[in-house]
Amino acid sequence: MVRGPKKHLKRVAAPHHWLLDKLSGTYAPKPSPGPHKARECLPLIVFLRNRLKYALNGREVKAILMQRLIKVDGKVRTDSTFPTGFMDVISVEKTGEHFRLVYDIKGRFTVHRITAEEAKYKLCKVKRVQLGAKGVPFLVTHDGRTIRYPDPLIKVNDTIKLNLETNKIESFIKFDTSAQVMVTGGRNMGRVGTIVHREHHLGSFEIIHVKDALDREFATRLSNVFVIGETGKSWISLPKGKGVKLSITEERDRRRALKGLA
C-alpha cells in the first residue's frame, strides 16, 4: 500500500502552460507546497531555465538561487521548485529586472517585464472575509495571505493593492460593473475587459459578462474573474496584446501587415 506524498511528476502529466517539450526528459519539476495550486503555478526553475534562459539545467538554477539573487514578492527564495503564480512579482537583484506573472491571451504565463516602481506592489483577490479569535476581523487572499484588521468596506471578490515592502493594504477596488478585469480560468483565460453585467443563479454559478477593448462580449464564471482596475484604467501594466483575443484570420492579417511594413 502506497503511503505519503507524491514526490515526482512525469513530464507528460505536467501542466500544458509550462510549455515543456516531451522529449527532453522523463520527469518535470514537482512544485513545492506553497501559495499557489500545483496546476496553476509556475515553478521558479521553469521560469529561470525555460523562459528567461538564465540557466541551461537544474544545477545552474540552484547555483543562482543559492546566491540569494532571486526574490518573489520581495522575499528571497532558494527553493528551485517554489510555486510562483498569478500576480507574483519576481525580481532579479543582479540585473535589476522585475517581472510580473500574468497570463497571455492563450492562458499561459508570459514573461512580462515591469518597472522598479511597479514592482513595489501587487494586486490580490479577496477570497474570504471573516472574524477570527477574540473578534479580530481578517481577510484571506488568492495567494494565501491572511491580513488582519482590513478596511470594513472590503468584501469577497474585491481586489486589494498590497505594498510588498510593508505588507499593508494601500487601496482596494470594488467588484462592480464597469470595473476592469482579467480572466484567470476557463476558455477565455488571459482576456481583459470591463464588467457589463452580473447574472445571479441561486444554487449555481454566477455568470459575469465582460466586454473587451474591441467591444466583443463574452461570459465566464465569477470565480474566473480578477479585478485589475477601475473604469478604463488598469492598476498594472498589461502584456503584449493588452488582453484582446483576435480570431485566427485577424492574427493572420496582422502578421501579413507587419511583413509588408518590414
UniProtKB/Swiss-Prot annotation:
GO biological process terms on file: cytoplasmic translation; translation
Keywords linked to the UniProt accession: Cytoplasm, Ribonucleoprotein, Ribosomal protein, RNA-binding, rRNA-binding
Localization of this protein: Cytoplasm
Entry-linked InterPro entries: KOW, Rib_uL2_dom2, Ribosomal_eS4, Ribosomal_eS4_C, Ribosomal_eS4_central_region, Ribosomal_eS4_central_sf, Ribosomal_eS4_KOW, Ribosomal_eS4_N
Xref: CDD domains: KOW_RPS4, S4
GO CC term, one of those recorded: cytosol
Record Pfam families: 40S_S4_C, KOW, Ribosomal_S4e, RS4NT
Ranges for domain S4 RNA-binding: 42-105
Coiled coil: none
GO MF, one annotated term: RNA binding
Gene3D superfamilies the UniProt entry points to: 2.30.30.30, 2.40.50.740, RNA-binding S4 domain
Comment field (misc): There are 3 genes for eS4 in S.pombe.
Subunit text: Component of the small ribosomal subunit (SSU). Mature yeast ribosomes consist of a small (40S) and a large (60S) subunit. The 40S small subunit contains 1 molecule of ribosomal RNA (18S rRNA) and at least 33 different proteins. The large 60S subunit contains 3 rRNA molecules (25S, 5.8S and 5S rRNA) and at least 46 different proteins.
PANTHER family recorded: 30S/40S RIBOSOMAL PROTEIN S4, SMALL RIBOSOMAL SUBUNIT PROTEIN ES4
Chain's role: Component of the ribosome, a large ribonucleoprotein complex responsible for the synthesis of proteins in the cell. The small ribosomal subunit (SSU) binds messenger RNAs (mRNAs) and translates the encoded message by selecting cognate aminoacyl-transfer RNA (tRNA) molecules. The large subunit (LSU) contains the ribosomal catalytic site termed the peptidyl transferase center (PTC), which catalyzes the formation of peptide bonds, thereby polymerizing the amino acids delivered by tRNAs into a polypeptide chain.
The family this protein is said to belong to: Belongs to the eukaryotic ribosomal protein eS4 family.
Protein name listed in UniProt: Small ribosomal subunit protein eS4A
Species whose genome carries this gene: Schizosaccharomyces pombe (strain 972 / ATCC 24843)
Taxon lineage: Eukaryota, Fungi, Dikarya, Ascomycota, Taphrinomycotina
